[in-house]
């Protein structure tokens, strides 16, 4: 089809929405390494994992063989409040960059949570409700996940306890208030509420917190209260299963117009958005049906892929969770107060880590001043104020489009616009005032954290 025949926004009909999630682990030749029980060093069992997660979610976490999982009708009906999400052809950005490249972005910010996180929040809350639980606990970085979960829990009548990374709790008070508006109890992490929080505060008295800290507190809170389970917004495979609706919708929309992306780009903190966006395309690559170039974009201040070590590590700072094999900076790593709070995680999804180790995807790291420069250009040209996390993908998508301008190649670029930045104005203020700092880790800082990796006989 010609360029003129492709609309600015491609909206699918509700009848075209995916009815199943896609679990691309089923198509992976090299499966992700199993989660390990830190006490035994052996793969975790369903019974062990069900003590932390809802039973159905524990089953999804351990299932690397079932390619498609039916989406319960109750979840589909909830999705219809904000899905299908638009796939946007960035004509204005293309003209601004004077590039022959075609640029598309999947916009996930058209719901009250402001991001893609609601896709998994409603699924996890649904399974918790079906199990008869009183409530759930969780962590949140920038607050998008906590907001999404508070919405889902309010809708289903569940109690919601959120441990929010301290620096984001202070930088993003309005997102905190959205969570409270939906009935969530929000605590800055590390806190005095949990034993692990008190321990971390004693060891790192000046800490700004981290996702790893908040995870530890949320897990402790879940396992010490009757009728509660822990749910999470990223990193684990169950989350990427739910987020596959992003990529599935994107592929359906592109296929309708005969479009095929050459490059697919997503920001990477724990991997939920990136894994969801690439899911059906990676499936085709794994099955040998098509080839794509996948690029994960992470902050230079927290470069798990580009400077981390591929090893077994704890998913949390307090060493409560199972061990996962992933690209990691070490669970004791305390990231700088980067404004992309959702990307301040020491590790990376085991699924994406395996794909990266198998050279099936690439990764780059970018500085936050370059990211915010791209964010402001995008906002002025495309009319959406992007979240700092999303802006990492925007930065690299623009860079790839500029390369096409220089080479004359007419590549098709797809990136994930994970959400809006309307609650991130403190970060934009710092950038506009010229007070934003870049944080680049030294080799010594990384080595010190990596040296504390757990000793796993025969593995680490």
Please annotate each region the language model reported.
Residues 107-118, 136-146, 236-239, 265-270, ...:
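Active-site nucleophile and cofactor-binding loops and adjacent substrate-binding regions
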Residues 123-133, 147-159, 180-181, 278-288, ...:
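Alpha-helix C-terminal capping segments
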Residues 268-276, 368-433:
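Claisen-condensing/thiolase-fold acyl-transfer catalytic domains that form or cleave C-C bonds
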Residues 120, 128-167, 260-274, 294, ...:
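A short, small-residue-rich loop immediately preceding and capping a beta-strand
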Residues 114, 118-122, 138-156, 170-173, ...:
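Short glycine/serine/threonine-rich phosphate/pyrophosphate-binding segments
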Residues 137, 145-208, 304-314, 425-433:
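Active-site-proximal loop->helix
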Residues 3-133:
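Positively charged, low-complexity intrinsically disordered leader regions
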Residues 68-70, 200-238, 246, 258, ...:
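Active-site/ligand-binding loops adjacent to catalytic centers
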């Amino acid at each position: 089809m010609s360029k003129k025949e492709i609309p600015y926004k491609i909206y699918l009909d509700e009848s075209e929405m995916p009815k199943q999630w896609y679990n691309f682990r089923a198509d992976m030749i090299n499966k992700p390494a199993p989660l390990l029980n830190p006490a035994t060093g052996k793969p975790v069992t369903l019974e062990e994992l069900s003590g932390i997660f809802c039973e159905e979610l524990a089953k999804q976490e351990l299932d690397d063989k079932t390619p498609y999982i039916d989406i319960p009708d109750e979840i589909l009906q909830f999705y219809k409040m904000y899905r299908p999400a638009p796939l946007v052809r960035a004509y204005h950005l293309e003209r601004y960059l004077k590039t022959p490249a075609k640029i598309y972005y999947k916009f996930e910010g058209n719901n009250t949570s402001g991001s893609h996180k609601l896709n998994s929040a409603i699924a996890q809350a649904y399974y918790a409700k079906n199990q008869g639980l009183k409530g759930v606990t969780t962590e949140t970085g920038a607050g998008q996940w906590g907001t999404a979960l508070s919405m889902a829990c309010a809708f289903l009548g569940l109690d919601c306890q959120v441990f929010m990374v301290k620096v984001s709790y202070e930088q993003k008070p309005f997102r905190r208030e959205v969570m409270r508006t939906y009935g969530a109890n929000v605590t800055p992490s590390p806190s005095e509420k949990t034993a692990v929080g008190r321990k971390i505060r004693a060891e790192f008295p000046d800490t700004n917190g981290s996702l790893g800290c908040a995870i530890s507190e949320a897990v402790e809170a879940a396992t010490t209260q009757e009728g509660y389970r822990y749910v999470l917004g990223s990193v684990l495979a169950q989350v990427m299963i739910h987020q596959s609706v992003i990529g599935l919708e994107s592929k359906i929309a592109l296929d309708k117009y005969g479009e095929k992306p050459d490059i697919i780009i997503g920001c990477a903190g724990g991997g939920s958005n990136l894994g969801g966006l690439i899911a059906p395309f990676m499936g085709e690559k794994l099955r040998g049906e098509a080839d794509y170039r996948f690029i994960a974009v992470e902050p230079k201040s927290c470069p798990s892929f580009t400077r981390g070590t591929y090893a077994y590590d704890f998913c949390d700072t307090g060493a409560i969770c199972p061990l996962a094999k992933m690209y990691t900076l070490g669970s004791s790593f305390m990231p700088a107060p980067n404004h992309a709070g959702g990307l301040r995680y020491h590790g990376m999804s085991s699924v994406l880590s395996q794909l990266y180790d198998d050279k099936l995807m690439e990764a780059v790291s970018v500085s936050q001043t370059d990211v915010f420069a791209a964010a402001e250009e995008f906002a002025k040209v495309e009319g959406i104020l992007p979240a700092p996390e999303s802006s990492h993908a925007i930065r690299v998508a623009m860079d790839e489009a500029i390369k096409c301008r220089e080479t004359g190649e007419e590549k098709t670029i797809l990136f994930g616009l994970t959400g809006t930045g309307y609650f991130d104005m403190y970060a934009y203020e710092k950038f506009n005032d010229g007070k934003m700092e870049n944080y680049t880790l030294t080799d010594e800082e990384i080595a010190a954290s990596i040296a504390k990796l757990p000793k796993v006989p025969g593995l680490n």
